[in-house]
């Protein structure tokens, strides 16, 4: 094996199979490109991105880990979002949640408009 070499199996690997997914239209209303990483709580993404933040609550991009989606100024694109899994805890980012996504009235208390 060569360092960095990929050894792939013969069967396809489907990422995020069986996850509840939604499609959301996103428009970059800003004057600079915006990138959002694969595991970022999408509802807290850059304020220049216009989309349904309530629908995006508790979700992330349905893309391979370690990658990102890029939104150029003025661009409109549809992205697929899946639910965050695991403990469903979000800390930091734009400080809208800072805890468990599903706790009591966390959705109502979260500032779903990015700062």
From Swiss-Prot:
It is found in: Cytoplasm. InterPro entries: Urease_beta-like, Urease_betasu_sf, Urease_subunit. GO terms for cellular component: urease complex. It is an enzyme of class 3 (hydrolase). One of its GO terms (molecular function) is urease activity. Its EC number is 3.5.1.5. GO terms for biological process: urea catabolic process. It catalyses: urea + 2 H2O + H(+) = hydrogencarbonate + 2 NH4(+). CDD domains: Urease_beta. Heterotrimer of UreA (gamma), UreB (beta) and UreC (alpha) subunits. Three heterotrimers associate to form the active enzyme. HAMAP family: Urease_beta. Belongs to the urease beta subunit family. This is Urease subunit beta. The gene is ureB.
């Amino acid at each position: 094996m060569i360092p960095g070499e990929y050894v792939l199996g013969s069967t396809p690997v489907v990422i995020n199979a069986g996850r509840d997914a939604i499609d959301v239209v996103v428009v970059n209303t800003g004057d600079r490109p915006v990138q959002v990483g694969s595991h970022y709580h999408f509802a807290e993404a850059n304020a220049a991105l216009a989309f349904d933040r309530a629908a995006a609550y508790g979700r992330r991009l349905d893309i391979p880990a370690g990658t990102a989606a890029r939104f150029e100024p003025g661009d409109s694109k549809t992205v697929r979002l899946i639910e965050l899994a695991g403990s469903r805890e979000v800390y930091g980012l734009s400080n809208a949640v800072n805890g468990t996504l599903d706790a009591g009235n966390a959705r109502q208390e979260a500032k779903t408009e990015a700062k």
